[in-house]
């Protein structure tokens, strides 16, 4: 079996296990019972079709088990492509007092400079990873302070003996999540000696298509999403963690399973025949 076929199969195994649990839950363990819904929420039932609440019943039981799906899939790709992957990996090292102060300074400037700059008639400061990191690393004075960072995903290239850390967020992360990730990444890059060879802010999928067109505003407060080399979006992330062809293997894995499970959901849960249009696919 080719490497990318192996990655696709491993990804599908993870998704299939999760989807089978969802289907077992909504069909057997906790099905939507119309009479129970009408008895518990008579006003809602009188105003809104039962089918709307049937769909929301499924959604609630789908989103909870899929909360950590991106991390699980990334670990599978890392294990198949690089040789080792793990979620919630703890990295412990030391960072000098001066570098920690500068990390705080950089983050505070990005968080609070808007209003002050406007009062002075100045342009807001734009995030620039390369210059920010250079500024932090140029001062290594003071005591070495113990620092612990928990990585969303950690991977090792077993052949090349290289270590990678990823702050992996959903494709549309909020501002607070992104700030925390940037602080963790700056600490990883500022450790002396370094405990990982590279660390990245990663989004597993780009709903805007190309990186140049990524326009979700919240992470852009902390990173230049189009230019910062520490940012990996979509195929950049999957190729880094799994090797060439991993992104297409991921896309193919999801779309193949999507056809199968959509048919089951229509017939077994909604009780209707699927439409001719199978719906959205990942691209």
How should these model regions be labeled?
Residues 78, 151-172:
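Conserved catalytic cores of phosphodiester-cleaving nucleases, focusing on short active-site segments
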Residues 90-159:
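Active-site metal-binding core of divalent-cation-utilizing nuclease and nuclease-like domains
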Residues 202-283:
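Domain-level recognition of nuclease-like catalytic cores that cleave nucleotide substrates
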